[in-house]
Amino acid sequence: MAFLTEPEPRRGAALAVRPGIRRVVAANRGPMTYHGTNTYLIDAPGGLIVLDPGPDDPAHVAAVLAAAGPVARILLSHTHHDHLGAAPALRAATGAPVYAWHDPAVPEFVPDVRLRDGDVVDGWQAVFTPGHAADHLCFAGPDGVLFSADHVMSWSSSVVSPPCGVMTDYFASLRRLLARDDRLYLPGHGPPLPDPLPFVQDLLAHRQAREYAIVATLGAAPLTTKALTDSLYSQVDERLRRAAERNVLAHLLKLRDEKRAADNGEGWVVA
């Protein structure tokens, strides 16, 4: 499928995405994060919102604080550290409460305000989209804008890494977005995604094709997750091989739950 690219962003700058929304890209570039985590600054009726503080990086925190001015609220899409890490420092510096879904599996983080599906924060509605993470939220706002975070990214497909990531949930959350009519996605990494629904359809088809390939490869002789990954992702960049193996495991667990595959103790076989 076709992905989007963009030039290396200017570090520390708050660049306009659309009226009332700016983006500061953290300096955590990598094979899993593209140019870095997107931290969004949103002008809202109740004051400025910081969405996804980003990694625990003093330079990034300083850039966000310099660009933001007074902060009314901090929203968090999910509790992966490249999005959560700077939240304590931003909260301490601004006094702004942190709003997030609360996942008991991450005991070191408790938000000030626990969000549930459908909650609205100053015009932005929480849309529960587990899959990439068990506590993942998108946020839907005015004019068809959806902060899609790491559920849908324009530059790459998402990693679904068990146990926090669940492929069955990921499929369901993609279908949930297909039932909506959002017109612009703002992802957790990479450039904005206009006209997103065909892209989401392609993502779902890509994952379904990968699942069909796994089923076609399985037989009576057991195969390890690594062996399946080596077969299905033979051309993958070595830096992404671990992520590919986690995705394959997530597919296998989904197939196991559907009674289409089984782990016989030596490896995976067709059920």
Question: What is each of the regions a protein language model found here?
Answer:
Residues 1-7, 20, 106-109, 132:
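Glycine/proline-rich low-complexity segments that form flexible loops, beta-turns, and polyproline
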Residues 2-3, 216-271:
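C-terminal regulatory/interaction regions
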